[in-house]
UniProtKB/Swiss-Prot annotation:
Residues spanned by motif Q motif: 58-86
Record GO cellular component, one term: transcription export complex
Entry's free-text remark on domains: The Q motif is unique to and characteristic of the DEAD box family of RNA helicases and controls ATP binding and hydrolysis.
TM region(s), chain numbering: none
PANTHER family associated with the record: ATP-DEPENDENT RNA HELICASE DBP3
Main function: ATP-binding RNA helicase involved in transcription elongation and required for the export of mRNA out of the nucleus. SUB2 also plays a role in pre-mRNA splicing and spliceosome assembly. May be involved in rDNA and telomeric silencing, and maintenance of genome integrity.
Family annotation (CDD domains): DEADc_DDX39 (cd17950), SF2_C_DEAD (cd18787)
Designated name of the protein: ATP-dependent RNA helicase sub2
Start and end residues of each Helicase C-terminal domain: 276-437
Family: Belongs to the DEAD box helicase family. DECD subfamily.
GO terms assigned for molecular function: ATP binding; ATP hydrolysis activity; RNA binding; RNA helicase activity
Subcellular localization: Nucleus
Length: 441
């Protein structure tokens, strides 16, 4: 089988989400015989939730983490764990499986990064931790999180593998015992190709992590890759899955990979709002969008802004238009080469650019702390995508502002779906604008 087929780019808006209900098979005749990784969804109520250690910490020291990790946490400026970290970390470090839903920006990534680094006893030439996510940018970001939290753990080696780059470079890293990673982060297509070609050995994996798990398990082809990789790992490993959105349909599928997991739903489906985020919409025609966007960028105070559009073509055209209007922007989408995408991501992350035009490739998990304005130039197709998009502003409980353009009947339907799903009434953007103190930290 060619690598071209293996390295499908799952990361952009062209990927159509399959109906989760359609993937639900008939209940198994004997649930007790189900194996981890068996994707036949049993009927009935979910299994009893795993017990967990309740803790109300005032600091990360209460988790009894390695001293090297505590030093790195202090260097990063973190003083108090978030709610999801307080609930998950004390149990996760005891090797318990974890299924966690929590809003964007509440520190889910740090849960599995700190947990796996605390547990890790690196052995040269062995991969002990495997982390998968659905986009290259998110994989790159997770790798960087491992780098900053492992700064005082010099023996820990981390590598990131994803499609769009020459696979030979990955093979070279894996062929050298000196560079062989203890922690592997990557996208399912590339990782499955490396495993199938016997370049990456997973026989020593002790922790198996899926970030934005619903995005991967919703897609038939990506789920197949995840399942193949899962079966190449030992049966007694720890499994952790995280997302901002976990529907009732996807939860049983996730739990098929686990044994009596700790289930953490920091907010239920109707309360997945984002604290500190001011949310508005503007009704206008398609032809009025550019003028209105120009007005907003001129009048609003912001640190960095991300502008979401529905296609790569529109991203390129809008980016070009903004630069012609003297707004220094960049565009990030799947049509850009991998090397260029990472370069642009770093430019934006390092505050060299303040305006980013993006498709849904930037809609999940990407954590850039200075973003405090998100504009839906094109509304997404559903409420979940809306939540992930606007969650780029107001990360980790900080203030932020989101504005959505509503230009047709489909947009109005999505707006109503958002209001119904999250039990909020989105107000129309006021004619006089908004006070910057309500969204500027």
């Amino acid at each position: 089988m060619s690598h071209e087929e293996d390295l499908i780019d799952y990361s952009d808006e062209e990927l159509q989400t399959t109906d989760a209900a359609a993937t639900t098979a008939a209940p198994a005749a004997n649930g007790a015989q189900d194996k981890k990784g068996d994707l036949t969804v049993s009927g009935g109520r979910p299994d009893k939730k795993g017990s967990y250690v309740g803790i109300h910490s005032t600091g990360f020291r209460d988790f009894l983490l390695k001293g090297e990790l505590l030093r790195a946490i202090t260097d990063c400026g973190f003083e108090h764990p978030s709610e999801v970290q307080q609930v998950c970390i004390p149990t996760a470090i005891l090797n318990v499986d974890v299924l966690c839903q929590a809003k964007s920006g509440l520190g889910k990534t740090a849960v599995f990064v700190l947990t796996t680094l605390h547990q890790l006893e690196p052995v040269p030439g062995e991969c002990s931790v495997l982390v998968m996510c659905h986009t290259r940018e998110l994989a790159y970001q997770i790798k960087n999180e491992y780098a900053r939290f492992s700064k005082y753990l010099p023996d820990v080696k981390t590598a990131v593998f994803y499609g769009g780059t020459p696979i030979q470079k990955d093979v070279e890293v894996l062929s050298n015992k000196e560079s062989y990673p203890n922690i592997v982060v990557g996208t399912p297509g590339r990782l499955n190709a490396l495993v199938r070609d016997k370049k990456l050995s997973l026989r020593n994996v002790k922790a198996f992590v899926l970030d934005e798990c619903d995005k991967m398990l919703d897609q038939i082809d990506m789920r197949r890759d995840v399942q193949e990789i899962f079966r190449a790992t030992p049966a007694d490993k720890q499994v952790m899955m995280f997302s901002a959105t976990l529907s009732q349909e996807i939860r049983p599928i996730c739990k098929k990979f686990m044994r009596n997991p700790l289930e953490v739903y920091v907010d239920d489906d109707t309360k997945l709002t984002l604290h500190g985020l001011q949310q508005y919409y503007i009704k206008l025609s398609e032809s009025e969008k550019n003028r209105k966007l120009n007005e907003l960028l001129d009048s609003l105070e912001f640190n960095q802004v991300i502008i979401f559009v529905k296609s790569t073509l529109r991203a390129n055209e809008l980016d070009k238009l903004l630069r012609e209007c003297n707004f220094p922007s960049i565009a990030v989408h799947s049509g850009v080469s991998q090397e260029e995408r990472i370069k642009r991501y770093k430019e934006f992350k390092e505050f060299n650019k303040r305006i980013c035009v993006a498709t849904d490739v930037f809609g999940r998990g990407i954590d850039i702390e200075r973003i405090n304005l998100a504009i839906n130039y094109d509304l997404p197709a559903d409420a979940d995508s809306y939540l992930h998009r606007v969650g780029r502003a107001g990360r980790f409980g900080t203030k932020g502002l989101s504005i959505s353009f509503v230009s047709n009947e489909d947009d109005e339907k999505v707006l109503k779906e958002i209001e119904k799903r999250f039990e909020v009434a989105l107000p129309e953007y006021p004619e006089g604008g908004v006070d910057s103190s309500t969204y500027m930290a």
